[in-house]
Each structure stands twice: as C-alpha cells, then as structure tokens.
C-alpha cells in the first residue's frame, strides 16, 4: 500500500492574532518541525496564500522558511488553491482564475522554487463540473476531491487505478473517507493502532489518499499530532506525495464527478443540497448574504479600472469573497454572529468606497447589511439558532436503542449487529493490550444499552464505521437484516441528520 496524505491549513485573512498564535504553537510549528526532522516524511500540503500573509504580518518567518525548506527536501508537495478560501462553484470564471493566480503569486513570493504545484485543492473540496476545464486551463494536472463526487456514493473507487475528468486531461484523486475519518475522529491515536485498523489495506498493492485539515493535529485534536509524527517513523508505511502516484499506477479511467464537497452526504447530493453549509435553501441569512455578495460584485465591475483606488478595492473584494461568513451562518451547528457581521461589513465597505456609486445602490447594499445583522441577532435572541441546532440533532437525540431495538420490525437486527461488532472490537483490542480502545468500545456499548449515547459528539456507530471497512460492516448487517441503508456525511462530526444506522 502507498499512502498519499493531504493536509490543508488555513485561517481567515482577518484572524485574531491570539487565535493564530494558539494554532501556530499547537499545530503549525510542531508539524513543520517534524517534517524537517523526519527523512521519511512525505505529505501533500495546501496552504492558502492568506495564511502565508498572516505568517509574514505577525512575524512567523520561521514557519515560512521551514515550509520552503520542507519543499526543497521533497518532503512536501504544495498544491494550488483559492487565495482567500472562496467557494469556487459560486464564482464566475474570471474570479475563479483570479483567486487561483493570486494564490500562486503569494505562494511563490514566500516559498520560492519550492512552490511548483501540479495539483489543486478546491476549498472545502467544493466541486462543480464547470470548474474542470478552468482548472486545466490554469495549468493544473490534477485536483483532489472527495470520493462522494464519484456518482454521489462512497466506496466506489478502485484505488489501483487513477482517474481523469471525461473530456479533459485533468486528473482526479479521490479522498477516501474511511481512513481519513478514522484519523480525524481520533479513533486511533498511535501508529500501531492505525496499522491494525488498515491491516487489509497495508497488505495490498492499492494506494490510499487521505485528506483533512492540518489543524486536526494538535489544535482540534490535542495530542493527535503524535500519531502523524509516529507515522513518519514507520518503515513499513510507504509514504508518497499525490503526484508520485502516477509513477506506480499507469491505468487511467475517465469519470464524471458530480457537484459535492468533502462534507456532502449521498442524501445531500440526491436532494441537490450538497452545498448546504454555505447555501441552505431554507436559511434566510444565507439568501441575504449571497444577495449582498452578488450585488457588491456587480457594482464593483462597473468601476473604471484606471481609477487610482481600483487596485486597493480590487484587493478588498478578493478577500471579501471568502467562504467563512456563509459557513458561520449555517447553524448546523456552526454559528458566529461576529463572523456573519464581519463578512457583510467587508462587502459594505467596498460599496462605500466605490467612486461615483449611485446613492440608491449604496442604500440597497446597506439595507442588505442591516438585514443580515438584524436577522442574526434576532435568531440568537429569539432562540431560532437553538431550534435549528436541535432540529438538526433530532435523529441523534433519540437513543440508538429506541431507534432500533425498541422500534420493532427488522430494526432490532440492526441494533444487535452493531452491539456485536462493538463487543468484538472491545475483545480484539484487549487481545492486543490496547486497553484504551477496549475501554472506549466497552463504554460505547454501555451508553447505547443505557440510552445515554445521544449526547456523544461523535456517535459510536460512526466510530465503528470509520474503524471497519465498509464491506465488512455491510456483510455483518446483511447477516442480521435483509435490507440496510445508510445516509451519512463525509466528516466525523456530522452537521446533517443521520440515518438510525
């Protein structure tokens, strides 16, 4: 098995310096230090240009130098991206290309010759078919997107083959959810545990592409950075960069990826709401945010490019196209009034400084801004945020035992299948003397049996699904139940309503 691990690191361009300092010490600095100290380390990395600007602004020049050195040593392959983490499916072609080229310029400025991207990471792995020819035109050989993009289902990729988008020469590498979520969920915290969990893969000739936020290691998951550093030391793990895979897997298959993100579920895609965290058709704040974004973009396009203020306002617009404000307004469960207001203000500020803007146009934009802020405060004050989050969690608020064993019909078979699989995981962990994992599975069974499982951030059923290969889970369930179907998203902390199993 060859393992291509992709990491994405990013902070909003206006990130508070104290938050940035925490992430630097907890995640970025340890990561770069260990990339430089382990000769066998190999990763593919995206760092948005906006984060490199922050490193420079706040004096983290050692991080910039360390990344450049890791690139020179061949331990890091850098990808392209959108400089300000814009959601590319929602932009016209010229803005997409500008975000990409601005990111290239910034990365080259700081990283020098180490930055020579063959591939591109789309923020949130947000893909739309219209992007493929544009990315090829931008000079990229491949992109990394989630496996859900392959027909809207998971576990359909043959990782002994490579893929390219039909009608183009743009290669596609699909992020595998099971192994990615196994790590992100901290189900495994040591290299030996990981090797046990992927033993079948290790013995094969296939490749694995994992993908996650770099902040997972140390910041989101304190202590999990040690797993990554242990992986760098394992002689029996063949680590490669994504571009290296072409040297080992010559067969290429055409495919037609569907619109998706790395958080989309099959249900999201079937329902046409694959971008729900940023564009929820039932979220009135989202609707206003997009109206203000589109209005500002249209107003800016009327500006004379020869005007002295054009470059400064163009730069402001680039950064204002970031996806953050939409994400923090989704309330499933992510919510921040500060981020909502800040994103709207950046757009209003552009309108305010457009020369010769029609007063009526400015008043229209200002009205959008006030509506967004007022609605955000109203949702918080009136409890709507709580209602949305509660509705989002309704399925998980019902104990698994009630949804299965006590539901009658064929559902008790589902309950027993999962209890038996978890019990088996406990026993296997005990045999390996992995008592931490054994206790985790023992406690999971106890909570399910006593109906206290609905309070877990990551449910035991989801943990089991990241621990065992999907075909093994399905085969086990098939022995207990004639028909079984699951609907779940691509990230371990779910923001969508989950199926009972």
Residue ranges of model-derived segments:
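Catalytic alpha-helical scaffold of carbohydrate-active enzymes acting on polysaccharides/glycoconjugates
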Residues: 1-118, 125-174, 181, 188-204, ...
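Active-site and substrate-binding clefts of carbohydrate-active enzymes
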Residues: 2-29, 33-38, 159-161, 168-170, ...
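Acidic carboxylate-rich catalytic motifs and surrounding loops in phosphoryl-/glycosyl-chemistry enzymes
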Residues: 49, 82-85, 122-123, 240-248, ...
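Residues that line or immediately flank small-molecule/substrate-binding pockets and catalytic motifs
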Residues: 124, 147, 177, 214, ...
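Short phosphate-engaging motifs
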Residues: 127, 216, 437
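Composition- and surface-driven signal marking solvent-exposed, interaction-prone regions
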Residues: 186-188, 221-226, 329-334, 441-443, ...
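C-terminal-biased regions
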Residues: 376-501
